[in-house]
Regions:
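A glycine-rich, Thr/Ser-enriched phosphate-binding loop motif common to dinucleotide/cofactor-binding enzymes
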Residues: 123-132, 212-221, 325-329
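C-terminal active-site/capping subdomain that shapes the small-molecule cofactor and substrate pocket
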Residues: 232-343
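Helix-loop-beta segment of a Rossmann-like dinucleotide-binding subdomain
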Residues: 117-124, 200-211, 315-317
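Oxyanion-binding "anion nests"
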Residues: 192-244
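Short acidic/glycine-rich loop or secondary-structure boundary segments that cap or lie
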Residues: 159-162, 209-212, 244-248, 262-263
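N-terminal Rossmann-like NAD(P) cofactor-binding subdomain of oxidoreductases
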Residues: 1-197, 232-234, 286-288, 298-299, ...
Length: 343
């Protein structure tokens, strides 16, 4: 089997570390691995698959000779992606920098793999909450046109990176010992006001826009339409940060053009790759972050008719946003390209 020269930009962060875990787990065929990060992390040693790697500072020349560049996200993507493409690498980017660029495919491999072939050097990985939702929407969309979607999310602190996870852990420890918790990260680190996340919910993920939606909510709306290739769908979203370490959950209400039976919906979901149907109310079986953390698949349950609206179903979906919502989805894109001789 051919092996590929791979670079990981942002190798020391949560998504970058997950890339390494998945490369080993999935036996991704690499001949060279270049770990890149900011100047702050340069020189750090990372042990991986029996070898010690030194993290290098990212520069415009960092991608010479690289076949596949996995970008873990962040502001560096916009700066370095053009340099990587110029050097001949294919960039799979986890940031929001290129997602809505009409020249850049926005891809979930189970949903719209055909879009990959149109790339011009960069392929965008969707937002984590978007990926999880469209995994649930696609099997339903294939059996009936969707008219409207209402989604509310319950998003884990790891969506805010290592800092978010550390803050929850520190706050829980402080409260358990009778101390005052310190908030410095959530909802948005760069904003002046921060709130305790331990034993709390924060109805703000990212900054507010002029329409009073947050950027996270608009990402879900805009990205879903692009991935599904359907601008007619009406979508509204409310995104909430919850005191869970890992795995996002979403309550999704879907109105269809025509009636969809529960039997047809269950059959479509159960047959779809990357989804586990965990839906047995009589036995109290339903998806929870506890079940999906560190797993590849997303899980769907609580499937039921909406008693208030015709041709409408409700479902509950959970997925590991660091895996399927980020690193796994990006690696699956690379695997698809290898399998179809696109790299």
């Amino acid at each position: 089997m051919k092996k590929y020269r791979v670079a990981i930009l942002g190798a020391t962060g949560a998504v970058g570390q997950e890339f390494l875990t998945l490369i080993e787990e999935r036996k991704f065929p690499f001949s060279e691995l270049r770990l890149l990060a900011s100047s702050r992390s340069a020189g750090k040693k990372i042990a991986f698959m029996g070898k010690e790697y030194t993290v290098q500072e990212t520069t415009p020349d960092s991608f010479e000779g690289i076949d596949i560049a996995l970008f873990a996200g962040g502001a560096a993507s916009k700066e370095f992606a053009p340099h990587a493409v110029k050097a001949g690498a294919i960039v799979i980017d986890n940031s929001s920098a290129f997602r809505m660029d009409p020249e850049v495919p926005l891809v979930v491999p189970e949903v719209n793999p055909e879009a990959i072939k149109a790339h011009k050097g960069i392929i965008a990985n969707p937002n984590c909450s978007t990926i999880i939702m469209v995994m649930g929407l696609k099997p339903l969309y294939d059996i009936a046109k969707i008219r409207r979607i209402v989604v509310s999310t319950y998003q884990a602190v790891s969506g805010a990176g290592k800092e978010g996870m550390a803050e929850l852990e520190e706050q829980v420890a402080a409260l358990a010992s009778g101390k005052e918790p310190v908030a410095k990260v959530l909802p948005v680190g760069k904003l002046p006001k921060h709130y305790q996340i331990a034993f709390n919910l924060i109805p703000q993920i990212d900054i507010f826009k002029d329409n009073l939606y947050t950027k996270e909510e608009m990402k879900m709306i805009d990205e879903t339409k692009k991935i599904m290739g359907d601008d007619r769908m009406r979508i509204t979203a409310t995104t909430v940060r919850v005191p869970v370490y890992r795995s996002h959950a979403e309550s999704v209400n879907v109105e269809f053009e025509d009636k969809v039976t529960l039997e047809a919906a269950r059959a479509a979901i159960a047959a779809f790759p990357g989804i586990i149907l965990r839906d047995n109310p009589a036995e109290q079986e339903y998806p929870m972050p506890l079940f999906t953390s560190n797993k590849y698949d997303v899980e769907i349950g609580r499937l039921r008719y909406d008693e208030s609206q015709e041709n409408t179903l409700n479902f509950w979906i959970c997925g590991d946003q660091i895996r399927k919502g980020a690193a796994l989805n990006a690696l699956q894109i690379a695997e698809y390209m290898i399998a179809h001789d696109l790299v």
